């Protein structure tokens, strides 16, 4: 099922645990700034277990998904697939025994996915398919039925779906703009072509950075973002002067 909601992805940091962490404890992966913000919001609502953390290495390397510590009775697993600030991404599709909730705000439509492996995907529009003010939700049918009925309608995913994403007056211009961008994606070759372009553009930058004795990218090369290329300077004094 597909739902368009108002607001940004940050609203999902609280809506997700409100709807799906009413009985069991969710697992959260701390793999960057946005994942960390999601954890801080979820803690206000429910108990949270951090199943992996890359904080100690300053988010420059992430454990393989298969090595995350996830209890079999977790409500769900949440993580951000592409961390914009740290310039790091999770390459693997989820393969958990519990539902996967994935923030794809900064990488949706930039790569091909096996959508069947994801239970809940969310993405704000302003990074890859429009202007701020709308959020795309892709949710499996059985999970939608588990939305918390005790919540006000505006915070309940099922209520939004039942009203065709028009529970209240939607951001019509945001929808219109997203539609224009979706059309452009199709005319430009679709997701596979976008993936080729993302790899090509990011590789050009990484090749320059890696061959330089001036710039540095500290991220594990196998986990570097294709959408957000970060760099520092080898000379910390110059870096401080630049900033």
List each model region and its residues.
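Conserved active-site segment immediately N-terminal to the catalytic lysine
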Residues: 101, 115-126
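A short secondary-structure junction signal
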Residues: 60-62, 87-92, 110-116, 132-135, ...
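Active-site C-terminal subdomain of aminotransferase-like
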Residues: 125-206
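Conserved PLP-binding catalytic core of the aspartate aminotransferase-like
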Residues: 216-243
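Solvent-exposed alpha-helices and their adjacent loops that cap or buttress functional pockets
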Residues: 20-21, 68-72, 92-95, 112-116, ...
């Amino acid at each position: 099922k597909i739902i368009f909601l108002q607001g940004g992805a940050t609203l999902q940091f609280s809506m997700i645990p409100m709807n799906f962490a009413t009985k069991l404890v969710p697992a959260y992966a701390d793999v960057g700034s946005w994942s960390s913000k999601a954890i801080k919001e979820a803690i206000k609502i429910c108990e949270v277990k951090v199943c992996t953390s890359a904080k100690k290495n300053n988010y420059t390397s992430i454990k393989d998904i298969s090595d995350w510590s996830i209890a079999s009775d977790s409500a769900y697993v949440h993580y951000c697939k592409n961390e914009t600030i740290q310039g790091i991404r999770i390459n693997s599709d989820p393969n958990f025994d519990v539902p996967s909730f994935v923030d794809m705000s900064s990488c949706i439509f930039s790569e091909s996915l096996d959508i069947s492996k994801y239970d809940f995907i969310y993405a704000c529009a302003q990074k890859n398919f429009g202007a701020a003010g709308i959020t795309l939700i892709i949710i499996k049918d059985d999970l939608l039925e588990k939305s918390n009925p005790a919540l006000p309608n505006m915070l309940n995913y099922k209520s939004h779906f039942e009203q065709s994403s028009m529970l209240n007056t939607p951001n019509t211009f945001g929808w219109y703009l997203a539609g224009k961008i979706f059309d452009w994606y199709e005319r430009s070759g679709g997701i596979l072509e976008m993936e080729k372009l993302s790899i090509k553009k990011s590789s050009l930058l990484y090749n320059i950075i890696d061959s330089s004795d001036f710039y540095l990218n500290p991220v594990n090369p196998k986990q570097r973002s294709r959408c957000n290329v970060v760099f520092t300077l080898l000379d910390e004094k110059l870096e401080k002067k630049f900033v």
